[in-house]
């Protein structure tokens, strides 16, 4: 009887050593899953795993809200572009924004 029981016990121990996490799989850390659930509720669609959700939540809390870019009102003359003229000077004709009287 003892010889017949020995191989089954050794095989059971071998299986237990090969798969050590299977006995702990029933115990789930519920606090971690609750934290991820809260992050998913706070930031829907921000990623597929918990790290991306946490990173986006931290970035949103640390950075100030963005302001729209500064807008400058441009006059119609500036919108058409600068008015260049051909000025003839000592070095010959050239493009310039405005001709001075000294050329």
UniProtKB/Swiss-Prot annotation:
Keywords: Glycoprotein, Secreted, Signal. Residues 1-24 form the signal peptide. GO terms for cellular component: extracellular region. It holds the Pfam family Sperm_Ag_HE2. The keyword Nucleotidyltransferase does not apply. It comes from the Eukaryota. The keyword Signal applies. It is found in: Secreted. Glycans are attached at residue 29. PANTHER family: SPERM-ASSOCIATED ANTIGEN 11A-RELATED, SPERM-ASSOCIATED ANTIGEN 11A-RELATED-RELATED. Belongs to the SPAG11 family. Has antimicrobial activity against E.coli. Plays a role in the defense response in the male reproductive tract, contributing to sperm maturation, storage and protection. This is Sperm-associated antigen 11A.
